[in-house]
Amino acid sequence: MGVTKKPDLTDPILRAKLAKGMGHNYYGEPAWPNDLLYIFPVVILGTIACTIGLAVLDPSMIGEPANPFATPLEILPEWYFFPVFQILRTVPNKLLGVLLMASVPVGLLTVPFLENVNKFQNPFRRPVATTVFLIGTAVAIWLGIGAALPIDKSLTLGLF
């Protein structure tokens, strides 16, 4: 929590404390040594202890053992790879699919240069960045949902 009160340097009590080297008590606790030597290690070690405790008391099983003679019909990646998987699955040329995936970060890197005259942080005053974000989010969700569907319904999501 930050200090919101500015010190009054004309206050004789504060001036006496500052002369004795006790000024930090007026402003709050110092970060060194209290936070860095006592509070942070307790939080870090407590987090590690909770993680190890959960791993020992409730271990997560990896899953059922693999059966090499029973392959599923369609192998899907993890959910966060669904949009990329959908691009590779629907684009006929694999090189074009890889170039499409590489164009996403390149396109995102060009957004600040397209809108470099706008110094505002309010998203409503940055229409290019807001439009790129909204369209990119909609496309990523569309591709992610489509990747979980069969290939014939993947682009239309079965709606059309």
Curated annotation (Swiss-Prot):
Record-linked InterPro entries: Cyt_b/b6_C, Cyt_b/b6_C_sf, Cyt_b6/f_cplx_suIV, Cytochrome_b_C_euk/bac
Main location: plastid
The keyword Ion transport is assigned to this record: no
Membrane-spanning parts: 36-56, 95-115, 131-151
Keywords: Chloroplast, Electron transport, Membrane, Photosynthesis, Plastid, Thylakoid, Transmembrane, Transmembrane helix, Transport
GO BP terms in the entry: mitochondrial electron transport, ubiquinol to cytochrome c; photosynthetic electron transport chain
Subcellular location: Plastid, Chloroplast thylakoid membrane
Family: Belongs to the cytochrome b family. PetD subfamily.
Subunit structure: The 4 large subunits of the cytochrome b6-f complex are cytochrome b6, subunit IV (17 kDa polypeptide, petD), cytochrome f and the Rieske protein, while the 4 small subunits are petG, petL, petM and petN. The complex functions as a dimer.
Protein name stated in the entry: Cytochrome b6-f complex subunit 4
